[in-house]
């Protein structure tokens, strides 16, 4: 393969013996941790019943790649529903934000979505002149999803809106929430692209507006 496990182009190092050994060790550890998370994350009850100390210990070691899509929404203040209630967003839906009228941020969002991870397999868009294009049949699906996510956030947080750099934060979350990378042990994983977007959107909101992170403060016009 010309890309690594995360979808980025492989460098010369990937073909070395050291890289192969590292990859084998990583895959073995990931397989062990995957089974632990399969036992810990219930399809309908989330992390209910899991001792806090155990959850913290495994969370700090990192959520296995195949479980990030399912785990991250559950881990943001113990679930998206609870987070939305605490943030006063209970009645707001992702789809309603996506369907918001055009805003003054659309132009800069349009420029940034095609600059996001340009060499990544999911974001790459091939056009005749070798450049990137926005919209149209040749647009990568991830770019379309990222555009909707960023527009939705700008509609939700009108004080912050959109600022250059937010596209990479949202893009990384979108890659982690990709249904194609979910664990085979995840019994409740949907393969719907719209679900991928929403699973990305609310962790983005939690990261930006949550009291422990307040990432949005770095993007405010007054910053």
Predicted regions and their residues:
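Amphipathic alpha-helical interaction segments
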Residues: 70, 168, 199-203
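Short, conserved phosphate-binding/catalytic loop or strand-edge motifs used
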Residues: 165-171
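Eukaryotic alpha-helical solenoid repeat scaffolds
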Residues: 199-200, 207, 211-223
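Alpha-helix N-cap and coil->helix boundary residues
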Residues: 66, 164-165, 195, 199
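N-terminal transition regions in large eukaryotic proteins
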Residues: 1-154, 174, 183-194, 205-208, ...
């Amino acid at each position: 393969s010309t890309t690594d496990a995360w979808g980025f182009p492989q460098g010369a190092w990937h073909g070395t013996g050291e890289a192969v050994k590292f990859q084998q060790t990583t895959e073995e550890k990931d397989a062990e941790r995957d089974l632990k998370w399969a036992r810990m994350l219930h399809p309908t009850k989330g992390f209910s019943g899991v001792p806090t100390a155990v959850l913290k210990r495994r969370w700090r070691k990192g959520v296995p790649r195949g479980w990030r899509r399912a785990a991250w929404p559950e881990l943001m203040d113990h679930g998206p529903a609870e987070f939305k209630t605490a943030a006063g967003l209970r009645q707001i839906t992702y789809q309603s934000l996506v369907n918001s009228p055009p805003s003054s941020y659309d132009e800069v969002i349009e420029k940034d979505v095609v600059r996001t991870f340009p060499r990544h397999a999911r974001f790459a868009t091939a056009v005749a002149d070798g450049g990137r294009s926005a919209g149209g049949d040749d647009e990568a699906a991830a770019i379309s999803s990222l555009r909707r996510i960023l527009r939705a956030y700008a509609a939700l947080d009108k004080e912050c809106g959109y600022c250059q750099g937010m596209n990479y934060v949202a893009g990384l979350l979108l890659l982690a929430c990709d249904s194609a990378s979910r664990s085979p042990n995840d019994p409740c994983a949907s393969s719907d692209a719209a679900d991928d977007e929403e699973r990305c959107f609310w962790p983005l909101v939690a990261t930006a507006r949550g009291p422990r992170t307040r990432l949005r403060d770095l993007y405010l016009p007054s910053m």
